[in-house]
């Protein structure tokens, strides 16, 4: 057991993981030019395993950070020479680095990014995710109440069977396309194709470098409906007419959309202002005067380009705006980051540790200088 602890807590592991992270940063930075920021993050930093050249498997950013976290934890807990008064500064620096890694893990696993679009005079409590989508099935049989069943993107993989107590049928995912476009068929489709796929097919496209510009789509098969609705259907993001089906005398709508998060508070846009560059149609700055409404109580807040609104773990940035025939609408970037405070706290802790270590070393340096002078 002691030998295992000695190996796992070795400082060499920390050095090797730092070097490998530097390699991943270089590879990820270079890859952004070809595949875009989001795809590069997913391939090199969010992945457990990264495939170099599509052939050689190497540790991805997530595994590397886990190894570093375990190594630092064992160093703090089991390195006997760290738990001495003369090493207090080094110990505090290690604890600060450990907190920084924990914060990074929380951010990587639980953080989310999206936007909130609000027209002047309207309010919203909904954030649409930038990256993730969801399959939404709406039972519209009851005129007074729509019943929603939502499946998140991670379970929309090829071959997955979706079922739910609200649904009296099953859905088999045939394919999930990161980016696609509808293409009109040049020949009649088979009788097993239903809805949009009778006249169109979904053609896979190369993913855009900017992930938010991709148009995901799925093809799926409805089974066990015990009706003529059994067959293959298709959906894509931004589809103007939702896919409908009547199954066992129940009316359903099928939609693929950006993943939605509903907040325990709402934001009402009172006034949107923009300042233009002189003689141009380019906006110099813009801001949103809003009401933050929680429990029926409004609080007036001004959101500007460099002054976001922070509330209950969410940060709302003034991102852009939309001008339409019915007026202006603000676009707020909404970020949920559970590890937001960790970099500040860990930086302070590491600074204190470094300062203590330097102060502890001053007497030795002075004695050494005096000996040299003598």
Where on the chain are the PLM-derived regions?
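Cytoplasmic C-terminal tails of single-pass
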Residues: 367-374
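Membrane-embedded alpha-helical segments of integral membrane proteins
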Residues: 15-78
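Internal alpha-helical transmembrane segments
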Residues: 56-143, 331, 335-367
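Alpha-helical transmembrane segments and their helix-start/interface "positive-inside/aromatic belt" motifs
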Residues: 2-20, 89-97
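Hydrophobic alpha-helical transmembrane segments
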Residues: 6-14, 35-47, 285-303
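Soluble non-transmembrane domains of integral membrane proteins
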Residues: 114-337
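Short, Lys/Arg-rich N-terminal segment immediately upstream of the first membrane anchor
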Residues: 1-11, 51-56, 83
């Amino acid at each position: 057991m002691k030998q295992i602890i000695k190996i796992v807590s070795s400082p060499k592991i920390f050095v090797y993981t730092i070097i490998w992270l530097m390699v991943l940063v270089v590879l990820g930075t270079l890859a952004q030019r070809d595949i875009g920021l989001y795809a590069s993050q997913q391939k090199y930093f969010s992945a457990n395993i990264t495939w170099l050249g599509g052939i050689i498997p190497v540790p991805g950013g997530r595994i590397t950070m886990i190894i570093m976290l375990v190594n630092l934890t064992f160093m703090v807990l089991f390195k006997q020479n760290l738990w001495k008064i003369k090493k207090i500064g080094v110990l505090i620096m290690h604890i600060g680095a450990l907190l920084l890694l924990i914060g990074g893990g929380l951010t990587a696993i639980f953080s989310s990014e999206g936007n909130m679009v609000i027209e002047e005079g309207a309010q919203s409590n909904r954030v649409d995710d930038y990256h993730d989508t969801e399959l939404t099935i709406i039972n519209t049989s009851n005129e007074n109440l729509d019943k929603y069943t939502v499946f998140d993107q991670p379970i929309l993989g090829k071959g997955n069977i979706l079922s739910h107590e609200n649904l009296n049928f099953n859905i088999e995912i045939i394919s999930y396309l990161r980016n696609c476009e509808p293409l009109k068929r040049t020949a009649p489709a088979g009788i097993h194709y239903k809805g949009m796929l009778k006249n169109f097919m979904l053609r896979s496209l190369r993913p855009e470098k900017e992930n938010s510009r991709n148009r995901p789509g799925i093809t799926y098969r409805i089974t066990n409906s015990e009706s003529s609705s059994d067959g293959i259907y298709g959906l894509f993001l931004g589809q103007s007419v939702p896919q409908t089906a009547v199954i066992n005398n129940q009316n359903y709508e099928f939609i693929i959309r950006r993943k939605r998060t509903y907040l325990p508070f709402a934001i009402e846009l009172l006034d949107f202002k923009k300042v233009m560059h002189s003689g141009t149609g380019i906006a110099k700055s813009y801001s949103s005067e809003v009401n933050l409404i929680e429990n029926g109580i409004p609080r007036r807040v001004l959101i500007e380009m460099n002054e976001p609104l922070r509330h209950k773990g969410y940060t709302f940035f003034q991102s852009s705006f939309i001008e339409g025939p019915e007026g202006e609408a603000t676009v707020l970037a909404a970020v949920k980051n559970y590890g937001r405070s960790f970099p500040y706290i860990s930086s302070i802790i590491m600074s204190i540790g470094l300062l203590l270590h330097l102060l502890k070393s001053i007497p030795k340096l002075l004695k050494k200088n005096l000996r040299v002078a003598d």
